[in-house]
């Protein structure tokens, strides 16, 4: 009996690990596709892209999960970011610090939102919206842009501030416009398709 219970527990743990791995892989793939499209389609002068919604999936993914589970998704996204920059951006060497800046931006925004109080990812009031805009739309892209614009300026011989302004605007607007819907979907408040929940039930978000 004890062996059966132990085996069942191990199977459950394996399912959780596989689930986490699959979700992380999907995050990395989605980031790579969005980032690649942004670089190819909205990078007009060889500098920073003018539209950047790619950070939003990472931000939303981290914001609804405990910080102790962030390392895997951050590493996977960093690899995806480096690959996109290497293939379609300003090269593999510049892609290393750019991926650090982008992943740090998503993590910082999510950390501020999680530390801001009681479940601010639900957007149930003006305070949660204000903290979200402050974290993901102002502080995180402004700070990440310092490194990002510096790397771009160094490798393209362009001016720093125009690239910082383009980075800040693109990352801020991209995350603000996309992340709220992603957060609601991840929390189960928006259903994909026609499936409906019975009245009186609440969706619970797994943190794995």
Question: Can you describe what each PLM-predicted range is?
Answer:
Residues 2-50, 55-158, 178-208:
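Short helix-perturbing small/polar motifs within transmembrane alpha-helices
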Residues 132, 161-174:
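Short aromatic-rich membrane-water interface segments that cap or initiate transmembrane helices
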């Amino acid at each position: 009996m004890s062996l059966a219970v132990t085996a069942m527990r191990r199977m459950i743990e394996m399912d959780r690990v596989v689930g986490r791995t699959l979700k992380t892989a999907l995050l990395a793939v989605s980031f790579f596709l969005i980032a690649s499209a942004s670089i190819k389609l909205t990078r007009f002068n060889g500098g920073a892209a003018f539209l950047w919604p790619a950070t939003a999936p990472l931000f939303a993914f981290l914001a609804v999960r405990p910080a102790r589970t962030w390392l895997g998704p951050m590493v996977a996204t960093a690899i995806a970011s480096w690959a996109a920059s290497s293939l379609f951006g300003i090269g593999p060497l510049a892609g290393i610090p750019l991926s650090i800046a982008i992943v740090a931006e998503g993590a910082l925004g999510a950390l501020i939102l999680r530390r801001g109080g009681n479940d601010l990812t639900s957007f149930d009031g003006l305070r949660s919206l204000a903290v979200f805009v402050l974290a993901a739309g102002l502080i995180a892209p402004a700070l990440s842009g310092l490194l990002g614009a510096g790397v771009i300026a160094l490798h393209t011989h362009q001016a720093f501030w125009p690239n910082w302004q383009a980075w800040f605007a693109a990352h801020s607007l991209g995350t603000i416009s996309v992340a709220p819907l992603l957060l609601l979907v991840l929390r189960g408040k928006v259903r994909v398709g026609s499936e409906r929940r019975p009245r009186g039930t609440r969706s619970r978000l797994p943190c794995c």
